Curated annotation (Swiss-Prot):
It catalyses: L-homoserine + ATP = O-phospho-L-homoserine + ADP + H(+). This is Homoserine kinase. Keywords: Amino-acid biosynthesis, ATP-binding, Cytoplasm, Kinase, Nucleotide-binding, Threonine biosynthesis, Transferase. HAMAP family: Homoser_kinase. Belongs to the GHMP kinase family. Homoserine kinase subfamily. Pfam families: GHMP_kinases_C, GHMP_kinases_N. SUPFAM superfamilies: GHMP Kinase, C-terminal domain (SSF55060), Ribosomal protein S5 domain 2-like (SSF54211). It comes from Lactiplantibacillus plantarum (strain ATCC BAA-793 / NCIMB 8826 / WCFS1). One of its GO terms (biological process) is threonine biosynthetic process.
Length: 291
């Protein structure tokens, strides 16, 4: 049996808009049960998620290999849909690896990343899903360039609101252009953040996660929990709270003990009715097991 596991991802790390992402230890697992005369995928997400060729995992696999032999698949996932934790990216990566494995192809991670970025539109979710850990990536001149940084010895306090926020709606909240001085500030903050992440200088990196100039201020009205969680963190002397992906999930990075204290506070706030997770990073990205 072929089993593929793909980690959840958190993109747009602070000012790292569309470019910095990390993998979290929350998995989508895909099992290949047996060949079939038609595509079928069993999953726990109900009627809104297709179980045939319209399913994103299968669509992606067929994009890579159009004549792929149909299979009966089973998918389990702890990653909530449309919450800013890379649910679509994990499906895309699972589909690409599925096609790669079923055909015995030897496409490299770099080749799969190129295709995944074409399908997703930007690399900051698909790159950590493929590679694991903390990844800085860009898609320019028709080429994806990704750099995997040392794995942060940090944990993530993850607050997931009950209501989804579709990426399309969240994107519509963004301006079509930025003032020059704001763009320069955003660039300098992002550059310094990357340097701090690369050297694991958390005294610099964690505050900079809250200095985004590109998207959070425009999306904040759609995600009131962002300021609420940040206020609780600041009351404990913690920085490092940011909007994960397009939202609505809010993440705070830090020490396990400090984040456990934060989550105890968040659980007492009656305005926060969603789910809380305290997660380590995923170091390896997509994994394949054959049995």
């Amino acid at each position: 049996m072929l089993t593929i596991s793909v980690p959840a991802t958190s993109a747009n790390l602070g000012p790292g808009f569309d470019s910095i992402g990390l993998a979290l230890d929350m998995q989508l697992t895909l099992q290949v049960l047996q060949p079939s005369d038609h595509w079928q995928i069993d999953h726990p997400f109900g009627a809104d998620v297709p179980t045939d060729e319209r399913n994103l995992i299968i669509k992606t696999a067929l994009h890579l290999v159009p004549d792929l032999q149909p299979q009966h698949l089973q998918m389990a996932s702890k990653i909530p849909l449309a919450r800013g934790l890379g649910s679509s990216s994990t499906a895309i990566v699972a589909g690409l690896v599925l096609a790669n494995e079923l055909t015995g192809a030897t496409r490299s991670s770099a080749e799969l990343l190129e295709v995944a970025t074409q399908l997703e539109g930007h690399p900051d979710n698909v790159a950590p899903a493929l590679l694991g850990g903390l990844v800085v990536a860009t898609n320019t001149d028709g080429r994806v360039r990704a750099v995997k940084l040392p794995l942060p010895m940090l944990f993530a306090s993850v607050y997931v609101p009950n209501e989804p926020l579709l990426t399309t709606a969240s994107r519509q909240a963004l301006p079509t252009e930025l003032a020059y001085h704001q763009a320069v500030t955003g660039s300098s903050v992002a550059n310094t953040l990357v340097a701090a992440l690369a050297t694991q200088n958390w005294d610099v990196a964690l505050p900079l996660l809250e200095q985004d100039q590109f998207h959070e201020q425009y999306r904040a009205k759609l995600v009131p929990a962002l300021q609420t969680v940040r206020d609780h963190a600041h009351a404990l002397g913690l920085t490092g709270t940011y909007l994960s992906g397009a939202g609505p999930t809010v993440i705070t990075l830090g020490d396990y003990g400090q984040l456990a204290t934060l989550q105890a506070q968040l659980s007492q706030d009656t305005t926060l009715t969603g789910q809380l997770f305290l997660l380590p990073m995923d170091a390896t990205g997509v994994k394949v097991q054959k049995s």
